[in-house]
């Protein structure tokens, strides 16, 4: 289960993307999390997913 706080979520997701997953889709599939919910939660605080960097920036 991922954290609800968007800034903690940002840190956790970016760390996992950097260290364990080659894409947001793979992270979401493996953790059984909604990609849309993660993207929206982080968009609400000004971050978007960059596939080229495999990070939310």
Show the residue positions of the predicted features.
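Short, charge-rich amphipathic interface segments used for partner binding and complex assembly
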Residues: 32-57
